[in-house]
Amino acid sequence: MKALRIILAGIILYGISNNSYSQTTDIQDATIYKTELFGSAATGSNTPFWMVSNRYGIVPQEAGNGLLNAGVFHNQHFGKGFRWGAGLDIVAAVPRYRNVFIQQAYAEIGYKSLLLSVGSKERYNSLWDRNLSSGDMVQSTNARPIPEVNLSMPEFTLVPLTKGWLQVRGDFAMGRSFDTDYLKDFANSKQVYIKNVLWHHKSFFFQIKDTENDFPLSLTVGVQHYAQWGGTSTDPKIGKQPQSFKDMIRVICGQKGGSDATLSDQINVLGSHYGSYDFKLSYTEKDWGAHIYYQHYFNDKSGMEFANKTDGLWGLQFDLPFLPWLNKVVAEYLVTMNQSGPMHFILFDRDKWQGGRGGGNDDYYNNGEYTTGFSYFNRGIGSPLIPSPEYNTDGSLGFKNNRVKSWHFAAEGDINTQLSYRVLFTAMNGWGTSYFPFLNKKFGTSSLVDINYTHPKLQGWKFSGSVAADTGTMLGKSVGFSLGVTKTGILKAW
């Protein structure tokens, strides 16, 4: 029976892959290069928040920094419906623990709408606007990419026999952390953490949209799941975590750990898990569009069953291409205050809260065994509005401020054909965690103004400048500016 289900799933996947809604032939057959020179200065000890956040982890947090980024990327179609690609991207940055590092190194092969990728690659899987959103709660652009094997359907693809009304996309990946040396340098001597962590994530989205007659209303619904597992603890008494093939299946399916797992993982599920339900309703006309969305975040089964009420990211976006100077506007509200209640009482009421389900104090992005939390190189993988462990000045690990209420506003537009801008403003409130609340609420604002300039006689060149500021007690006070130059071009067209 299981084999039959696998065969049927394969047939359905093959059928869908041959009905691409966003054609892969749009990918340019070429070998391209990209170089970027960036530098910033600030009055505080840290670079202003929005100069650092959602940059795939390449901009150093410390004030007075600079970086050089150089990459080569190849895409080429071959045969009937096949394509392959590869990329190498190297960053040199100061000040930083390691001044030169590989940001991206991957190879991939695709058929129709399917893509198999191996290595570290900057991806964007979120439904929210890439330039203006504060960030996806499960997989944002805030941290460096984790090396992984990723099988995906990256673009929405038509489902057969639905008359163009139903499209799907998703991915499935297994990866591994390579930040052990960094954590050893950052963490104080009292910190216990798991090194060489293994990762799993998957997502599935379906979209109800009229692709034939342009009916303006559409609905997108999705689910995302991320998990940390395996690895070896720096505490010899804890040692190596379960990481057999059977354990991998347990992590994928969200099941309890075996007899070799910790007591907590035997009671709940193996590893540390994070996820979300994503909802987006869109109304799109030829010259304008409106989108309303909600991302319901969860750490365990209680959150999956909405015991954490309305926690998550709420958003509104307007697309305004008919306006001369304003193209898009985004407003978001992030709230993580409920967390299924203030106390984790799973051990006190076993009849009500069965194994595999948490019972309060979900402690978003944190975990008892995986003390680094939902981060890579100490940058949060999810929303940057829950401040990353990199902001911990005492060498401690984990997220110290995950009970937040934040408002975020953003806009972008074109002043003329050569000059564009982006504006971000965020007001943040933080109360610490349920176990370790702040004595006084922390508050702060972060703002950014980006200006980008291109010239028709300087093909492939982009010049950028930014001014940013942080205020209040949340992140500290800092005012800064940055300058950047980017050059892209084609080495060879195929």
Language model feature labels by segment:
Residues M1-I27, G489-W494:
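Bacterial Sec-dependent N-terminal signal peptides
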Residues Q23-L68, F78-L88, V168-M174, F463:
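Transmembrane beta-strand segments of Gram-negative outer membrane beta-barrel proteins
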Residues Q23-Y33, H74-G85, Y97, G110-L114, ...:
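Short loop/turn motifs that connect adjacent beta-strands in outer-membrane beta-barrel proteins
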Residues A42-G44, D89-P95, K121-M137, L158, ...:
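Sequence/structural signature of outer-membrane beta-barrel proteins
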Residues V52-Y56, D89, L132-G135, D185-K190, ...:
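Extracytoplasmic loops and strand-loop junctions of Gram-negative outer membrane beta-barrel proteins
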Residues G79-Y111, R123-N142:
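Surface-exposed loop and membrane-interface regions of Gram-negative outer-membrane beta-barrel proteins
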Residues R123-D235:
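Internal, well-ordered domain-core segments that constitute the primary functional module
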Residues F215-A227, G231-W494:
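Exposed, low-structure sequence patches enriched in small/polar residues
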